Amino acid sequence: KEGYLVNHSTGCKYECFKLGDNDYCLRECKQQYGKGAGGYCYAFGCWCTHLYEQAVVWPLPKKTCN
């Protein structure tokens, strides 16, 4: 599974500005989803890869980013 890293309190994606390989996104994806996860910056949001199937990613149901 893969998807955008989401802030559970706001419903917003984690923003990033350095597209492609991005240490911030990689670190945040690993912190939230475990050391097996990967991450990079895609369309100005942190995109996480190699997630477990139950991982929660953006968008959150009933929670819009504002």
UniProtKB/Swiss-Prot annotation:
Please provide the record's keywords in A-Z order. Answer: Disulfide bond, Ion channel impairing toxin, Neurotoxin, Secreted, Toxin, Voltage-gated sodium channel impairing toxin
Q: Which InterPro entries match?
A: LCN-type_CS_alpha_beta_dom, Scorpion_toxin-like, Scorpion_toxin-like_sf, Scorpion_toxinL, Scorpion_toxinL/defensin
User: What Pfam families does UniProt report for this protein, alphabetically?
Assistant: Toxin_3 (PF00537)
Keyword Secreted attributed: yes
Which residue pairs form cystines in this protein? Answer: 12-65, 16-41, 25-46, 29-48
Gene Ontology MF terms in the entry: sodium channel inhibitor activity; toxin activity
Please indicate if the UniProt record lists Secreted as a keyword: yes
Q: Which residues form the LCN-type CS-alpha/beta domain?
A: 1-66
Q: Which subcellular locations apply to this protein?
A: Secreted
SMART domains, A to Z: Knot1
**According to its UniProt record, where is this protein mainly located?**
secreted
Source organism, top-level taxon: Eukaryota
Sorted alphabetically, the Gene Ontology BP terms of this entry are: defense response; envenomation resulting in negative regulation of voltage-gated sodium channel activity in another organism
Which Gene Ontology CC terms are recorded?
extracellular region
Tissue specificity field: Expressed by the venom gland.
Write out the function statement from the record.
Beta toxins bind voltage-independently at site-4 of sodium channels (Nav) and shift the voltage of activation toward more negative potentials thereby affecting sodium channel activation and promoting spontaneous and repetitive firing. This toxin acts on human Nav1.6/SCN8A voltage-gated sodium channels. In vivo, is lethal to mice 40 minutes after intraperitoneal injection at a dose of 5ug. No activity is observed when injected into crickets or woodlice.
Protein family (similarity comment): Belongs to the long (4 C-C) scorpion toxin superfamily. Sodium channel inhibitor family. Beta subfamily.
Q: Print the domain comment field.
A: Has the structural arrangement of an alpha-helix connected to antiparallel beta-sheets by disulfide bonds (CS-alpha/beta).
According to UniProt, the name of this protein is Beta-mammal toxin Co1
Q: What organism is the protein native to?
A: Centruroides ornatus
